[in-house]
Amino acid sequence: MQKLLRGLPSLYLSAAGESKKMNIRERQYFMFRKAIPVWIEGHSCELNSICLFSAEFDAAEGAELVITANSFYKAYLNGEFVAFGPARAAHGYCRVDRFSLAKRLRQGKNLLVVEAAGYNCRSFYSLDTPAFLQAEVRTESAVLACTGRDFTGRVFAERVRKVCRFSYQRAFSESYRFSRSPAEVYAAVAKGGKVVPAEGAEPLPRGVTYPQYESYVFRACGRGTFAVRNAPAPFRERYVTEKRLKIFPVSEFETFPAEYIGAFSYMPGRGRSARLLRAGEYALFSCGVLRAGFIRLSFCAAENSRVAVLFDEIAGEPPAVVDFTRNGCCAVIEYSVAKGGFSHASFEPYTAKTIQVLVLSGKIADLRVSVVGFSNPDACRLRLSCSDVRLERIVEAARHTLADNAVDILTDCPSRERAGWLCDSFFSARSERLFTGENRTEQAFLENYALAPPLENLPEGMVPMCYPADFEDGTYIPNWAMWYLIELYDHTVRTGSRAAADAAVRKAEGLLRYFARFENEFGLLEDLEGWVFLEWSGANSAEFTKGVNFPSNMLYAKMLECTGRLYGKQELLEKAASLKVTVARHSFNGSFFEDNAVREDGRLVRKGHISETCQYYAFFSGVASPETHGKLFVLLSEKFTPARDASRVGQGICKPNAFIGEYLRLIVLMRFGRRERAAKEFIQFFYRMARRTGTLWENSGTEGSLNHGFAAYAADLIVEYLCGFRGFRGNAVRIARIAPPCNCRIEIPTPCGPVRFVCEGSESFFDFPEGFYPEYENAVAHEAN
């Protein structure tokens, strides 16, 4: 037990490992009693290894399922879906799920079936480590069934193995060949394969709330016909061709729907009914809000049939109905089914607002489509009503966005990547606290980083740009590593807990050593290695980032300051203050902060490259303020609006992208007294998204993810605008002294009850739960934190 506890994050060590009197329930939480990791012999390291395992057991009072796996599992009890998991963990670890089976058991014999996937490929979503399943059904006094003793299994041949990936960032797409009903498959004993011990991992508690599996019905909204337009064009996206991802060669694909579907043309028909569809016909389904989860189809096949399911976060442009490659994905699920009843949900979670079902051959009737949701139920805790319905609607869209991106770790999107990106997490973590009253998902995210071993393809001291992940090359973003330490400080202040910071001491020391290598004679970072990334705009062009990149140095100064405060290092605080002055001296040309300087004859020379985003980095980092650079601040506030015509205003100055430039702009405007300007801009920016998909987007347009975690930060901006709430400092509630702009009622959750704010007419007041107290601040802040 002590050996196990030595490997656990400090959060759990402080809660359990330091106690000498752990009760039996605590011990059981950290380990399996008898289960061992297993897999089907010879398949634990193969690409896209999908297996079925099963065990029969007698019903018993208090029975629970304890389970983990790598990469993922889906559990069924007596044919009924139980759960998908586990929550992701660092290399060498696995998070353990525990479920009560009390309400699901039937008298006598019960059958547990587990569908498990070991992807064994490189991705931003899961680890490239050997597959295993570890599970047991138990009561307080007995183990009723466990892997290594009672489970049988087989390769899940119904799922086609050699297929295209879903995306560059995620593993393999889904194609199935069912010779009998899936309901029969998931309610039958799995046998025929040799189940053997496998390489496992150190178990950890799940740490986060179990997801909500609410079913969302998609309504039939159209139908039509399709036909082959011409010979299929080769579908050769990078995730189809780059061998370093660990993929199957195209020549070995057993099916390739992305290619043959690309040759189809569509003809809309009349009516919406999906009661009967023949070969060459399609039905279209939609939902009012973009949903994240498992796509489920139910129908009756009048004969053996082939069906393709295309899905996307928005309706396609005519003549296509669903652009299944729009978001850099192969968003297709393919089925070959036998005559009879059929019902199946995708193994993996995806996102969809529009779903198109194509009958490739055969005939089906009574088609129904739904999504089994996969989201964080705690996001419902924030309550807000407001006389401005636009603000209400944006907050509701932010709620959906946060819930879908805070399931096991903080993710960028629940579609293309499901990856735990730094920088994004800084913003979504603040939103998690606002919506849920806690930061359980961020804690798990930061624990994974703290537990991550040194990765072979990264320089010494560097942390991965997203995690848990196994990259296909040595790509890393030094700027995102800076955001890691900035977030650690923000998390510590926000939660009042030092667990994450204490667990990350070595990571912080490693990063400080890493960046010190690039400091020049002025203390400025010069010729940073890796992918110097600021945002997707001209600010990130090679001409702007080479040499001494000033936005990177502005962020470095903030990183040093936050790290100094976090660990009580006065020398880092002094270094940060000095660096801010140095950056301003070298970057500011009298009107604007320039983006970079390069060496010419041994001297640093500014090159006249100016981005709008650089200006916001300056104010966000504390290099600039309205007091020190008042003229620039006024110009940015009044003239450099999102609607700026760059050919007339600020000629030659690159416009920002949504993330991160526009977000930094909104923060700067809010904190430095331009609340009404900020409100006008964020309503204009986010409201159209909320109306169209009920979620908030990666970009200002529809070219990327339409459900992106960091965008939930819109709710933080709105709540601050309405009542002055700026977040928590432990149990202190930070409140700016403002005049509320309209009538509203807000309940901000905490573990002890909500912080309430009411504004009616000229009267407004706060009410605080026991243990929480206000910390009032000036409406115009001293720094943009």
Give residue spans per PLM region.
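Short, surface-exposed charged micro-motifs
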Residues: E64, R296, R756-V758, F765
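Active-site core of glycosidic bond-cleaving carbohydrate-active enzymes
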Residues: G420-I746, C752-R756, E763-E777
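Short "repeat-start/strand-capping" segments in structured domains, especially the N-termini
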Residues: T351, G761-S762
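Extracellular/oxidizing-compartment recognition motifs
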Residues: L11, G17, M22-S415, D424, ...
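Generic recognition of long tandem-repeat/solenoid scaffolds
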Residues: A274-R275, A283-S286, S343-A345, F593, ...
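Beta-strand elements of well-folded, non-transmembrane domains
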Residues: A69, G118-N120, C752, G761, ...
